[in-house]
Amino acid sequence: MAVFEMRNARKAFGALEVLKGVSLKVEKGEVVSIIGPSGGGKSTMLRCATLLETMDSGTLAYGENVAAREENGKSVYAGKAALAQVRRQFGLVFQQFDLFPHYTVLKNVCDAPISVQKRDRAEVEAEAMVLLDKMGLKGKENAYPYQLSGGQQQRVAIARALAMKPEILFFDEPTSALDPLLTGEVLRVIRSLADEHMTMVIVTHEMPFARAVSDRVVFLDGGVIVEQGSPEQVFENPQQERTKEFLQSYRETSSAQA
């Protein structure tokens, strides 16, 4: 059974239809990168997947837990308790870190497992220290966010998401708010998670990274999935004109910036 499945998701903001029947299934251990131009629907799809936005129509499930079913052409969401269970199954890492500025690094990582999952504090803190070491943040547990670089803050955010022991982790442009010099350290952490077969969906504009780390690449444009396949297929032999145009535009922009 898929860890995550969205079917025929539609979402409009007023007269603007942002998602036009998007379907995505992610299997355990799979790494899926979602690429595409700005305004193509990537972040909206991710927000619907993680219950930050509601779909107008379509279904959404995490394993056996159904978050939204469809009735009479509209999405009908599960009750509060069922959605709380669904939320425990995924983690989300935002562009802007969203750390609590008045909490130490350790408290940022430990707060939700202790307060939401009601887990033992000593156990959670011990696991958090291991996670911070894994993130290259050993010795930073008592620091506050303002004392860290953007790359370090993003790695704290990743550790915080992992502390909840999610079955799948979503990333929304995890390097877009970072100085280019700090991007590599965050991408290395995500790559290490992929090597450990962590199930992940990554919205990214980092094409070389998407190519290197993904099992599958999805090109989303105009609110629809235009093309998807292995990194080799999508990047080396795209079948759709819109995919070819997007990748060519990316290459030209990258060359101009080099």
Language-model features: locations:
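Conserved ABC transporter NBD signature motif
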Residues: 58-72
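ABC ATPase "signature
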Residues: 228-229
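Catalytic Walker B motif of ABC-type/P-loop ATPase nucleotide-binding domains
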Residues: 169-172
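A short, proline-enriched helix->beta-strand linker immediately N-terminal to the Walker B motif
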Residues: 163-167
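Short coil-to-helix segment of the ABC ATPase nucleotide-binding domain corresponding to the Q-loop/switch region
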Residues: 103-111
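Conserved ABC ATPase signature
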Residues: 144-148, 152
